[in-house]
Amino acid sequence: MTSEKGAPYSEAYVWIWLPGATQPVVAGLLSQQGGALAFNYGRSYLARPDAIAIYAPELPLRPGALALLPGLSMPSCIRDASPDAWGRRVLINRKLGMTGGDAPQLELDELTYLLDSGSDRIGALDFQQSATQYVPRHTQKPTLEELLTAAEKVERGMPLSPELDQALLHGTSLGGARPKVLLEDGERKFIAKFSASHDLYSVVKAEFIAMRLADEVGLDVAPVHLRKALGKDVLLIERFDRVWSDGHWHRRAMVSALTMFELDEMMAAYASYEKLAEIIRHRFVNPKATLRELFSRIVFNILCGNTDDHARNHAAFWDGHQ
């Protein structure tokens, strides 16, 4: 794929929000090397007294190009910040003007997904073409009705007006396969999940009920709200990777369980609860409480019939050390 100026992307500067910071700094460079993407930290970043590793088990804080883990084509902790199925579909629609039936056959390269998606992505990273100037890719604040209309058009493979196209940009960096966008309401930020056109029942309402039940039985889950837009259910999930403090937003770094497993999507079948429990015992700040939470979630998922409990759907905060 190509940049806005027509030339292929060959690199992306990785910007990071350090713990407690309200503005990002450049951490390093992600560059194309053959069929893979390699990362190296910048000298100025390594010289900072407050520098932290993006994720030390994979990208330790040291100079030079960092070798990829076996089987990976890019650092998994950076892939965590990239769009997933829905965000990629929106970007394909945006860049190529695909039709509905063409969507599964079309793909963009990873640098395009990183550099053309919205900046308010999960975790504490973003990606820019510049090493000196940070320009966030944000949008105006559309209504839920406008966002739902745009999402439905993408699902049907229909072209978007410039206004609707811009409205969906904000949610392109999100993971997951279902239609979703990002919303901000004062001192809270939300992920809004929409019904899909092929749903046989209100899946988002079922998810709302499941999350409320999880909260009732003592699991640590995000606050959720159910709203209506154009007569359809919309699930609002409060974001836990953003903290509003002293008039500013702070970002919390996160890594997925897939990254902790040192796997990618092609190898996700090798992930297991047993391996995750072992990682928790050795690396987490409070392993006993975390293991109890993990076991409780496993039991709850079985009881409520959740079959979407894959490794990308588990994540942990990263403070630069643990």
Model-identified regions with their sequence ranges:
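Phosphate/dinucleotide-binding and metal-coordinating scaffold of catalytic cores
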Residues: 1-311, 315-322
